[in-house]
């Protein structure tokens, strides 16, 4: 056995934590009953529990070193985060162990995870304002929240107390658990602030004398780490589940088991001390119950022997095993327990009835606790700032959540009001239905049904528009449903705020026995339920619904789903019931035949054709049934196309409303096989859509080379044709391509291959599109350097019409007498992109040298030097123009190189590689570059690049 050293005495408690329950340290208590203990959490990110446990234990063992005084460091924090992400696929792309640089990280915070004092302290954190954080009301978006207001902007410290109250009340108006306030974490100097917070902790913890002072310092800094949010993901696991517990164990305290750990953003330090103490108390309870061999039922969840066995089998943490075998004989366990009890003693004074509802089980103790309590105390709802499980709830709510039968009996005896709604709008009946405890439901129903307002109470809706019946359907048992329906006052078809009825919720939550019970009770079948059945591709359930309710055969949505599921037997039933075989089934007026093709079932397609389905109908976009072949899976397309064209060959060249025939669809999905089949069937390639695009305009961007070659063989003139934006197919494809670093090389090779077709066919490379861009302009903007060089060698130019006109209209006097103005005016005629501008300058230089551009206006190319007079003003101005072009080229080159990233070794390597492998190739192929003195050292962002020409 390994002997324990003094750095982390609280490891004694971690060792005592029952192995089969250790997952509770990482899974929020609010999820235990709903998600079957650890299973829901683990299913979202497989491997996360083992990773988090190994991180906690391995770091704890590292901290626990002989003769070494522990001091927190940024390096330790990074190691915790890296270990939390080990073997967790979901986190690998988030760079475990690496800090954010400028990546935005945001999340919503509901009122249930905030307090007035917490918001006040949050707004007072100076580093949030300095670092560019944002906080305020808004709406969630795909790339982060859209703020209606940012409270950090122009924040006046004197206004913070009143502002904090107003913010909390605004959050509550939207709902206790609903989110309408968002936080965008610090964007600048994350590493600097992380180091400052760490040093602040190391300094302050040394000055603390009492355990409460130390606890406050710990939670204050954990809170700062949390709001800094230095990592892209798993910040909670890193700081709350790992670092916090290490710091607690360093003080000789047990690790924390939270009901709701996500309160470290907008709770105050004092409030967080209570939250953490409550979580420590949970750990003590779990350990004590395990020692007494009594079932652990904290927050109403008890894991079965089967679940415990499955978890132990899954458990894989070598460091945890080491801790389980450590020798604690040098420690004084009694002293540790007394220290913990003293720390937690302050909890006894707070929320006695509410805490009793969760933690007391002895009927005698419960009776004594409630003996002298009045009605207001029994029905008290705790206000903001308390541990989250208490806020807004009465003792009755908590007794139901915890499955505390003895407490519920005593509360009922004391006439507790079971119709009171918490801040989420839930009554005790809602929680009984959600927990699925038939005994508790029976007790509450008995009380409620004896009241005059029973109908009203039974149908009370929470903030989500759900009654207790909705929760019973979603989380309960058939027995619960039966108990509620037999009251004969439950509205079984009432929808919640999202439009879901009880039967829909049961189906979505895989409560199939409850679904059957409700179906047999005559529950209505909504379109939303049918959509859920379609999403699950559940033919069996649709068949079950039809068998129970034949009226559904007249429901158009049900027919659409039967078609989409590809079920011939179900479709037959609808047609026999008199449904029109060509009835439009979607808002786009897709027919049953179209949707059957979409489903990819040749048997169903053949059946509908046999029954007389019309092949000539189109949807609102003019798509025929042959167009719909390409909405099906690739493996089904050939069979479907053969069935349809055998019935109606004219569909092969029938265009849709945009002018695109089915061949276009084959090109869009890059299906070489089907494109070849359609071409062999006689598909034409000379069509144009409404924007003048031919088939190659689509093919060149989307398709592999073989399809394009097949089309070009059919008609090579398509390469020349320009659309309404004046682009030929190559030009258009280049314009539409969105370049990404990961695929840039592959994209450029594709265009290099395509350019061979242009050069072979003699396509004009210098036509300008509607925006005045040539092919070379666009290739430069995409930084396809090898393609640019190839095009330049073939005679491609940038668009120099504007600077060329300027030079042709410039006279010698304007050039020679006002050289600075001339240079600036010429610079304005160039493109803003330095790469394109360099190429424009090169084209101007070459054309001037070759006398294709005459500048100044009076310059004659063969003008010589007079022996007596020397060079004329026009000749001098001509030379000045060439000199200015060289200066501008040099400045644009400097600008281009100066913009290259150079912060960090990897960025410097990438910039150097970019220059050596790509940019240098372009520059060396520009004639003017040979006339410019190029530097061997160039300043880039944050570094100097070595340039070897």
From Swiss-Prot:
Cell location: Secreted; Host cytoplasm
Keywords linked to the UniProt accession: ANK repeat, Host cytoplasm, Repeat, Secreted, Transferase, Virulence
One Pfam family linked to the record: Ank_2
Domain remark in the UniProt entry: The FIDO domain mediates the phosphocholine transferase activity.
Listed name of the protein: Phosphocholine transferase AnkX
Reported function: Virulence effector that plays a role in hijacking the host vesicular trafficking by recruiting the small guanosine triphosphatase (GTPase) Rab1 to the cytosolic face of the Legionella-containing vacuole (LCVs). Acts as a phosphocholine transferase by mediating the addition of phosphocholine to Ser residues of host RAB1 (RAB1A, RAB1B or RAB1C) and RAB35, leading to displacement of GDP dissociation inhibitors (GDI). Phosphocholination of target proteins also impairs accessibility to GTPase effector LepB. Can act on both GDP-bound and GTP-bound Rab proteins.
Keyword Repeat attributed: yes
Listed result of changing residue 229 to A: Abolishes phosphocholine transferase activity
Domain spans labelled Fido: 155-289
Family matches, as InterPro entries: AnkX_ins, Ankyrin_rpt, Ankyrin_rpt-contain_sf, Fido, Fido-like_dom_sf, T4SS_AnkX
BP term (GO), one: regulation of GTPase activity
Superkingdom of the organism of origin: Bacteria
Any one annotated GO CC term: host cell cytoplasm
Organism for this UniProt entry: Legionella pneumophila subsp. pneumophila (strain Philadelphia 1 / ATCC 33152 / DSM 7513)
Entry's EC annotation: 2.7.1.-
Primary location group: secreted
UniProt repeat feature ANK, residue ranges: 391-420, 424-453, 464-494, 498-527, 554-583, 588-617, 658-687, 691-720, 725-767, 771-800
Catalytic activity: [Rab1 protein]-L-serine + CDP-choline = [Rab1 protein]-O-phosphocholine-L-serine + CMP + H(+)
GO molecular function, one term: phosphocholine transferase activity
